[in-house]
């Protein structure tokens, strides 16, 4: 039996109260986003310290009591060159890794599984188009949020659903995302995924989950009254457990 179902709170990646940082990365893409954030944060700290130092130095050395007669400066070629070149260099160091990460998000891979997510007001429909039942119908199900009164021990309020998206870990997945009514957004922070669901349009994104677990997300596009009540739950399991789950769903 799958231990994730026995101890649902032990293996989960979900938002926590007063959380300021990122959730633990479960995909190479999310790991890249966190690494890029840390690199940019380093530059921000250096710039902040430098600006504060210049500000304090100016307030100290150029106080009106120390310089009752201010010096008139109308042009400074050297300082203009410095404050043009240095920011350009910093922006270059930030842009190179960010562009590399951006292009890697659009990298096309040969997926083992394709899943279509359709946003509705206010639930999700999932279609596993690679599998057909005996009547030639693809594996399709709706995913609704579990009301607070129906939650079991260990389940998370406003985040748990009646039907999870079950996928195999360490497998290339392709998500095709669209909407049946208004704009939605399929977002799971631990997976580094946020893809808009647009009516009449198919958006796609690739996912490679490195470890087994349960990953929680929510619709991230204002879509009406119950926008905050259409969570997303992705459960990554072993390949054997995934095959068993698909077989049970098709029976």
Curated annotation (Swiss-Prot):
Example GO CC term: the record gives:
mitochondrial inner membrane
Q: Which cofactor does it need?
A: Cu cation
Broad enzyme group: translocase
State the UniProt keywords alphabetically. Answer: Copper, Electron transport, Magnesium, Membrane, Metal-binding, Mitochondrion, Mitochondrion inner membrane, Respiratory chain, Translocase, Transmembrane, Transmembrane helix, Transport
According to the record, the segments passing through the membrane are 40-60, 76-104
**Which GO biological process categories is it annotated with?**
electron transport chain
- The answer to keyword Amino-acid biosynthesis applying to this record is no
Please list the residue ranges that the record places on the Mitochondrial intermembrane side of the membrane.
1-39, 105-251
- Write out the residues that bind Cu cation A1: 184, 219, 223, 230
Which Pfam families did the record assign?
A: COX2, COX2_TM
Q: Report the subcellular localization.
A: Mitochondrion inner membrane
Give me the residues that bind Mg(2+), please: 221
Residue numbers binding Cu cation A2? 219, 221, 223, 227
Q: What does this protein do?
A: Component of the cytochrome c oxidase, the last enzyme in the mitochondrial electron transport chain which drives oxidative phosphorylation. The respiratory chain contains 3 multisubunit complexes succinate dehydrogenase (complex II, CII), ubiquinol-cytochrome c oxidoreductase (cytochrome b-c1 complex, complex III, CIII) and cytochrome c oxidase (complex IV, CIV), that cooperate to transfer electrons derived from NADH and succinate to molecular oxygen, creating an electrochemical gradient over the inner membrane that drives transmembrane transport and the ATP synthase.
Query: Under what name is this protein listed?
Result: Cytochrome c oxidase subunit 2
């Amino acid at each position: 039996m799958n231990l994730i179902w026995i101890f649902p709170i032990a293996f989960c990646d979900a938002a926590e109260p007063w959380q300021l940082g990122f959730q633990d990365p479960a995909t190479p893409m999310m790991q890249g986003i966190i690494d890029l954030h840390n690199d940019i944060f380093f530059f921000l700290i250096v710039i902040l310290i430098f600006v504060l130092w210049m500000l304090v130095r100016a307030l100290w050395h150029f106080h009106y009591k120390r310089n009752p007669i201010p010096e008139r400066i109308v042009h400074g070629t050297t300082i203009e060159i410095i404050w043009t070149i240095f920011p350009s260099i910093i922006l270059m160091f930030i842009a190179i890794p960010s562009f590399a990460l951006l292009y890697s998000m659009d990298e096309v891979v040969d997926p083992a599984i394709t899943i279509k997510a359709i946003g509705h007001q206010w639930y999700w429909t999932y279609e596993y188009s690679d599998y057909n039942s005996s009547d030639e119908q693809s594996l399709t199900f709706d995913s609704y949020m579990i009301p607070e009164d129906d939650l079991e021990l260990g389940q998370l309020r406003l985040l748990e659903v009646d039907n999870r998206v079950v996928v195999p870990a360490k497998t290339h997945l392709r998500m095709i995302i669209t909407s049946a009514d208004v704009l939605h957004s399929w977002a799971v922070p631990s997976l580094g995924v946020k893809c808009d669901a647009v009516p009449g349009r198919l958006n796609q994104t690739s996912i490679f989950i490195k470890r087994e677990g349960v990953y929680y997300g929510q619709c991230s596009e204002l879509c009406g009254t119950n926008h905050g009540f259409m969570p997303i739950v992705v459960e990554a399991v072993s390949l054997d457990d995934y095959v068993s789950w698909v077989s049970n769903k098709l029976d």
